[in-house]
Swiss-Prot record:
It comes from Lactobacillus acidophilus (strain ATCC 700396 / NCK56 / N2 / NCFM). InterPro entries: Peptidase_C15, Peptidase_C15-like, Peptidase_C15-like_sf, PGP-I_bact-type, PGPEP1_Cys_AS, PGPEP1_Glu_AS. This is Pyrrolidone-carboxylate peptidase. It is an enzyme of class 3 (hydrolase). HAMAP family: Pyrrolid_peptidase. Belongs to the peptidase C15 family. The active site is at E78, C141, H165. Homotetramer. One of its GO terms (biological process) is proteolysis. Its EC number is 3.4.19.3. It is found in: Cytoplasm. One of its GO terms (molecular function) is pyroglutamyl-peptidase activity. GO terms for cellular component: cytosol.
Length: 200
C-alpha cells in the first residue's frame, strides 16, 4: 500500500509549520507500507491542485493531510469536512476566496474514510494525547480536506482520505498562553495513527 502524507508550509507570518516538519520526520515505511511525503502551499484551491497532481503521479491508496491547529493540546483526526470556506483571513497568496461553498455541486459534508476511533486509541497507547475532532475549521485545512473528499467521489472512488490536526510546537508559543507538543511526540503520535489507519 502507498500512503501520501501532506503537510502545509508556514502561514500567517509564522516561520515554521509543525505539519510539514512532522511529516518530513516520518519514516519512509510504516509496517511495510510506503510513505510518500508532500509539502503543500497554504493557499485555497492551489493546495488541492498540488495534491491532485501527486495522486495522479503516485497513485496512492490513502491520502492523509496534516495541518496545524493552534490552541489544541492533542493530535486530532478530523471526522468531517464541510462545504464552506471563509476568506476573512488571507492565505499565503495574500488573498482569500469569496465566503461560501467550496464546490457548488458538492455535498454539505463528507465523512472521512479513516478509522479515526482506532487511530485515537493507537495514538494514546503510544503515550501521545489524541482525540477526535468534529471541526476542521473554515480555512485552508478544511478546504483541502473537503476538496480531497470531493475528488474521491468524482475521480478517485477507491481512495481513502482524511485529515489530522496537530498542536503548536513549543517554539511557536509565547508566555505559555497556548498548548504545545514537541516535534518528537508529534512524529510518534502520527506514526501510531497512520499505522492504525493502514492496518484497519
Amino acid at each position: 500500500m502507498k500512503i501520501l502524507i501532506t503537510g502545509f508550509d508556514p502561514f500567517g507570518g509564522e516561520k515554521i509549520n509543525p505539519a510539514i516538519e512532522a511529516v518530513k520526520k516520518l519514516p519512509d515505511e510504516i509496517d511495510g507500507h510506503q510513505i510518500i511525503k508532500l509539502e503543500v502551499p497554504t493557499i485555497f484551491y492551489e493546495s488541492a491542485r498540488v495534491v491532485k497532481n501527486a495522486i495522479e503521479k503516485y497513485q496512492p491508496d490513502m491520502v492523509i493531510n496534516v495541518g496545524q491547529a493552534g490552541g489544541r493540546a492533542a493530535i486530532t483526526p478530523e471526522r468531517i469536512a464541510i462545504n464552506f470556506q471563509s476568506g476573512s483571513t488571507p492565505d499565503n497568496s495574500g488573498k482569500g476566496p469569496k465566503e461560501g461553498k467550496i464546490e457548488a455541486d458538492g455535498a454539505d459534508g463528507y465523512f472521512t474514510q479513516l478509522p479515526i476511533k482506532k487511530m485515537v486509541t493507537a495514538t494514546r497507547k503510544a503515550g501521545v494525547p489524541s482525540e477526535i475532532s468534529n471541526s476542521a475549521g473554515n480555512y485552508v485545512c478544511n478546504h483541502l480536506f473537503y476538496e480531497l473528499q470531493y475528488m474521491r467521489v468524482h475521480e478517485f472512488p477507491n481512495l481513502k482520505t482524511g485529515f489530522i490536526h496537530i498542536p503548536f510546537l513549543p517554539s511557536q508559543v509565547k508566555n505559555g498562553r497556548h498548548p504545545s507538543m514537541s516535534l518528537s511526540y508529534m512524529v510518534k503520535g502520527l506514526t501510531a495513527s497512520i499505522k492504525a489507519a493502514v492496518d484497519a
